[in-house]
Curated annotation (Swiss-Prot):
<comment type="subunit">
    <text>NDH is composed of at least 16 different subunits, 5 of which are encoded in the nucleus.</text>
</comment>
<keyword id="KW-0793">Thylakoid</keyword>
<dbReference type="InterPro" id="IPR022885">
    <property type="entry name" value="NDH1_su_D/H"/>
</dbReference>
<keyword id="KW-0813">Transport</keyword>
<dbReference type="InterPro" id="IPR014029">
    <property type="entry name" value="NADH_UbQ_OxRdtase_49kDa_CS"/>
</dbReference>
<dbReference type="InterPro" id="IPR001135">
    <property type="entry name" value="NADH_Q_OxRdtase_suD"/>
</dbReference>
<keyword id="KW-0874">Quinone</keyword>
<protein>
    <recommendedName>
        <fullName>NAD(P)H-quinone oxidoreductase subunit H, chloroplastic</fullName>
        <ecNumber>7.1.1.-</ecNumber>
    </recommendedName>
</protein>
<keyword id="KW-0150">Chloroplast</keyword>
<dbReference type="GO" id="GO:0051287">
    <property type="term" value="F:NAD binding"/>
</dbReference>
<keyword id="KW-0618">Plastoquinone</keyword>
<dbReference type="GO" id="GO:0048038">
    <property type="term" value="F:quinone binding"/>
</dbReference>
<keyword id="KW-0472">Membrane</keyword>
<dbReference type="Pfam" id="PF00346">
    <property type="entry name" value="Complex1_49kDa"/>
</dbReference>
<dbReference type="InterPro" id="IPR029014">
    <property type="entry name" value="NiFe-Hase_large"/>
</dbReference>
<keyword id="KW-0520">NAD</keyword>
<keyword id="KW-0934">Plastid</keyword>
């Protein structure tokens, strides 16, 4: 009697780069045994544009419009890190009013980023309704951005020594009204989502990361705080005026996808608390340190140089970066966004190394999805929160 043997063949599947759950042009090469994930290999680089090399051939002001294309959903943070480096290299003092305006814009940008994480994350695991709800509040944030900066996205608002323009008349009252309304919207999200049994089935206990493991992988932001580590650069470095405001670090100890969801939801309410304090305590005075223009150096082009022959005009005066090196960082919505900057006494940086949080956080994805089901990949990847413009640079 012949006994039939079951033959098991592994299947290799390409997920992305055009898959709607990839949040950009990420490609995953999956090895599957039925529904079980045996191996996962991320393929990056489809959105690589050479942002670091572009920075080394531009002045800081020329480079500002480029940086908003890294994380194009939280552009205020990429602008902040771009001007913080030269400010620290040159010992440039930022007026208190400008620092408060920056904090307000950064926290509004954090809220907008978390909202546009929440909607697609819920859609990935099968809940369509929140995807439409989040755009209602996100439009209000973009209305505030448009009134203050002139742009809904890609704002180009931060400047060395301050910001590009002061807040318009009536903007503070409009922003305070938004803060009061948004707290009710967050409570509506929590009633709709947090205790939903289907949602809990999809996220609870999925993609668990321990605290020590998160540190060893170099994770940051909500990924780190959801694993029981109370670490927030706004508290640690106290950049801008965060040290003058009263707020708390939101964290969870479970380390799963549910914990990362809870951290981001509570971070939005903390951002509202920060914005309200900043709006009520914003001082008067200038919004830009005009003394910085005294450091601008004008160079005469050579008669056979590029400017004379092709541009037909003199280059504008620009701030020279001192011959030093510096690492500067901010707490972006996805984690620690940093820049390693080397100046060489010229208008162009000698080295501009970007430390993107999404790229570092994405490293742990293959380990998290192994021995999980195929459907859990969307949950885990969505809970990491990546933007491929920032990952590939």
């Amino acid at each position: 009697m012949n006994v039939t043997t079951t033959r098991k063949d592994l299947m290799i599947v390409n997920m992305g780069p055009h898959h709607p759950s990839m949040h950009g042009v990420l490609r995953l090469i999956l090895t599957l045994d039925g529904e079980d994930v045996i191996d996962c290999e991320p393929i990056l680089g489809y959105l690589h544009r050479g942002m670091e090399k572009i920075a080394e051939n531009r002045t800081v002001i020329q480079y500002l419009p480029y940086v908003t294309r890294w994380d194009y959903l939280a552009t205020m943070f990429t602008e902040a890190i771009t001007i913080n480096g030269p400010e620290q290299l040159g010992n440039i003092q930022v007026p208190k009013r400008a620092s408060y305006i920056r904090i307000i814009m950064l926290e509004l940008s954090r809220i907008a980023s978390h909202l546009l994480w929440l909607g697609p994350f819920m859609a990935d695991i099968g809940a369509q309704t929140p995807f439409f709800y989040i755009f209602r509040e996100r439009e209000l944030v973009y209305d505030l951005f448009e009134a203050a900066t002139g742009m809904r996205m890609m704002h180009n608002y931060f400047r060395i020594g301050g910001v590009a323009a002061d807040l318009p008349y009536g903007w503070i009252d409009k922003c305070l009204d938004f803060c009061d309304y948004f707290l009710t919207a967050v409570s509506e999200y929590q009633k709709l989502i947090t205790r939903n049994p289907i949602f809990l089935e999809r996220v609870e206990g999925v993609g668990i990361i321990g605290g020590e493991e998160a540190i060893n992988w170099g994770l940051s932001g909500p990924m780190l705080r959801a694993s029981g580590i109370e670490w927030d650069l706004r508290k640690v470095d106290r950049y801008e005026c965060y040290g003058e405001l009263d707020w708390e670090i939101r964290w969870q100890k479970e380390g799963d996808s549910l914990a990362r969801y809870l951290v981001r939801m509570s971070e939005m309410t903390e951002s509202i608390k920060i914005i309200q304090q900043a709006l009520e305590g914003i001082p008067g005075g200038p919004y830009e340190n005009l003394e910085i223009r005294c450091f601008d150096i004008e160079k005469d082009p050579e008669w056979d140089g590029f400017e004379y022959r092709f541009i037909s005009k003199k280059p504008s005066p620009t701030f020279e970066l001192p011959k030093q090196e510096l690492y500067v960082r901010v707490e972006a919505p996805k984690g620690e966004l940093g820049i390693f900057l080397i100046g060489d006494q010229s208008g162009f940086p000698w080295r501009w190394k970007i430390r993107p949080p999404g790229f570092i956080n994405l490293q742990i994805l293959p380990q998290l999805v192994k021995r999980m089901k195929l459907a859990d990949i969307m949950t885990i990847l969505g809970s990491i929160d990546i933007i491929m413009g920032e990952v590939d640079r």
